[in-house]
Amino acid sequence: MDRDALLQRYREGPDELEAAVRGLSDAELDYLPRDGGWSPREVVHHTADSELTSAIRLRKLLAEENADIQGYDEMEFSRRLHYRERPIGASLGAVRSSRETSASIVDHLSEADWGRTGTHSESGPYSVEMWLEIYAAHCHDHAEQITRAVQEARQ
């Protein structure tokens, strides 16, 4: 996928995530899939925290030389940040806001900016281009995860 298509997909992510949870009951939001995965509620909060983290990663890549990009423990975030208990509205808003501000930065990147790199603490070399490839799919992947969990819950 070229950059323009990736950026368009990136921009569409919040709409798809919101559509996946629209009209769900608390029971559906809290359904724990048989495969041991997260409930739809937990997925929304994870997506928000990941998007907030991704926004900082983009900014570090662009503003710092050889930026250090930190990984984080997703399971500890889920547990310590009370993913199972919190309402999802603010997290959906955080996803949208993070995406809009980051997309506006990406709209202004030069060719040199696209080549900026850093090092991810878990996966090694990490570039602005890689950032967009990863996060263009992120909301869509989690919307599909939510849809699968809800389908299972309704069986």
State where each predicted segment sits:
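Alpha-helical bundle segments that constitute or directly flank the non-heme di-iron/ferroxidase center
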Residues: M1-D26, D49-I56, K60, I134-A137
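Acidic/His metal-coordination segments adjacent to aromatic residues that form catalytic metal sites
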Residues: D2, P40, F77-S91, E122-M130
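Conserved aromatic-histidine-acidic binding/catalytic patches
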Residues: A5, H46, A90
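Acidic/histidine-rich alpha-helical segments that form the ligand environment
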Residues: R9-A20, S78-G115, Y135
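Short, contiguous alpha-helical
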Residues: D30-E74, A103, E111, G115-Q155
